[in-house]
Amino acid sequence: MARVISMSDAINEAMKLAMRKDENVLLIGEDVAGGAAVDHLQDDEAWGGVLGVTKGLVQEFGRTRVLDTPISEAGYMGAAMAAASTGLRPIAELMFNDFIGTCFDQVINQGAKFRYMFGGKAQVPITVRTTYGAGFRAAAQHSQSLYGLFTSIPGLKTVVPSNPYDAKGLLLAAIEDNDPVFFFEDKTSYNMKGEVPEDYYTIPLGKADIKREGNDVTLFAVGKQVNTALEAAAQLSERGIEAEVLDPRSLSPLDEDAIFTSLEKTNRLIIIDEANPRCSIATDIAALVADKGFDLLDAPIKRITAPHTPVPFSPVLEDQYLPTPDKIVSVTLELLGEPALN
């Protein structure tokens, strides 16, 4: 039976179901058991991290499976990688994806390489949950969107859900996966609500989803920007333009077939990605389509991304920094040779 719950609650529920199903699943990270650096809280008062996503887990599973750590991403990420390589299935919470630089070796040079280095005999079934994205008024060091960086690393899988239903099913699939999976959660979407079944279900990694069908243009959007694209598609529909909104859901593995199937209908592609443009997912998808699907195109590929600057702290500048429905509508009208917005 489906209920309407938030993205945060859907992610929380996925972790609970996974931990109930498999005693080898554990949670490790800063403040995942307690409140944000508040040592005196009792377990029955624990907030569940700075954003409350792990609330209630320590009460049900105890502190042997829900582990608070010191402020050392290198330390607990190394411990989690080691635990995964010896048979456990840790969920490691990296509070902000901006902090990944402190544990590059553990993730990129160790965990991502084990299966390959040991001829496929080693498994590292770790899920790294982390937050990304601007719009939270958190300034340059807590607002980056770094999923493209991890997508470029062989041996890592990357998942970026856009809604509560997908978040639950994709997280359960990630936890079941025998390779390291980075699961990116948009901070500003935690309160987004949608219908989510109560039971245990998975969504296969590497399977895209068409969030809205259309014949005039394909809007390939990543994570939170799927919802921005849907808003733009609704506005375009009022002008008689039907945009297809394609949500990749996972970036590695990537559902290339879904992209080309959509382009066979629309023959036009706009990529919406809130990360910086250089060496980004937007750039990669554009190159992929240019290499393998050029004959499907009736117009140039367009990209709508953040500028190549750090995320500004000023709310006015931050709002301009991100893709918006109006930006998407304007680029679409230009691509189709339609009159511009007034």
Curated annotation (Swiss-Prot):
Entry-linked Pfam families: Transket_pyr, Transketolase_C
GO MF annotation terms: oxidoreductase activity
UniProt EC number: 1.1.1.-
Pathway annotation from the record: Ketone degradation; acetoin degradation
A single BP term in Gene Ontology: acetoin catabolic process
UniProt keyword annotation of Transmembrane helix present: no
SUPFAM superfamilies (UniProt xref): Thiamin diphosphate-binding fold (THDP-binding), TK C-terminal domain-like
Keywords per UniProt: Acetoin catabolism, Oxidoreductase
Role, per record: Catalyzes the 2,6-dichlorophenolindophenol-dependent cleavage of acetoin into acetate and acetaldehyde.
PANTHER family: ACETOIN:2,6-DICHLOROPHENOLINDOPHENOL OXIDOREDUCTASE SUBUNIT BETA, PYRUVATE DEHYDROGENASE E1 COMPONENT BETA SUBUNIT
Subunit architecture: Tetramer of 2 alpha and 2 beta subunits.
Name of the protein described by the UniProt record: Acetoin:2,6-dichlorophenolindophenol oxidoreductase subunit beta
Organism the protein comes from: Bacillus subtilis (strain 168)
